[in-house]
Amino acid sequence: MTATMQTERHALDVIYERRAVRAYKAEDVSEERLRALLEAAVHAPTAMHHEPWQFVIVQNRALLKRISDRAKEIATAQAAHHGNLLKRPGSAGDGMPSPMADPGFNIFYDAGTLVVICAAPTNDFVVADCWLAAENLMLAARADGLGTCCIGFAVAALNTPEVKAELGIPSAVHAYAPIIVGVPQGDTTLVPRKPPVILKWIRG
């Protein structure tokens, strides 16, 4: 645990303050801070205490750019499937072009670190386990003053044979949860959330 994370903070404060960060400073995240995040990740709940998660950490900007370009190719080819997800954030109309068509757009938002949470698909719960680990990692990052963002559009590219080979991911292992990590450029606006949708509250 880093010095910043040792400061007492209420767990709910960290939960409510976490936001997807899409603008990062150029400075890299140290190995010490990343190891603290990974330690938090592996303390996530896991079905039957299976602990299936494995991690790949990428801090090579040229490689991140190549993966970003490959992910954009795949997303553009599957545009009909992705639908509104390909619109620019906040766009309601059809006239706004997809950022995937912009050669300068980086799906990792120029963050210097990508953490890929992987697992062998040995049971029905490994996907949930990996995303629970991702949430722990993101909350720990927020507590340490770092920003994170889930990059779902990277999943398809990360699971292509050529990218898996470059990242050292075995063929029997699947990349499930790609999370960028970095030092935020300023504060991220807090976005109001919808209230919980309760289908039914059953009491005894």
Language-model segments: residues:
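A glycine-rich helix N-cap at a beta->alpha junction
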Residues: 75-87, 166-191
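Glycine/small-residue-rich phosphate/adenosyl-binding loop
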Residues: 51-128
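Short alpha-helical scaffolding segments that buttress acidic/His motifs in well-ordered protein cores
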Residues: 15, 37-41, 179
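Glycine-rich, charged/polar anion/phosphate-binding loops
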Residues: 39-43, 99-102, 163-166, 184
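Glycine-rich phosphate/pyrophosphate-binding beta-alpha loops
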Residues: 42-50
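C-terminal helix-cap and adjacent tail motif
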Residues: 2-7, 11, 17, 98, ...
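Small-aliphatic-rich amphipathic alpha-helix that forms the alpha element of a beta-alpha
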Residues: 41, 113-165
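Short acidic N-proximal helix/loop "leader" segments that mark the beginning
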Residues: 1-28, 32, 36
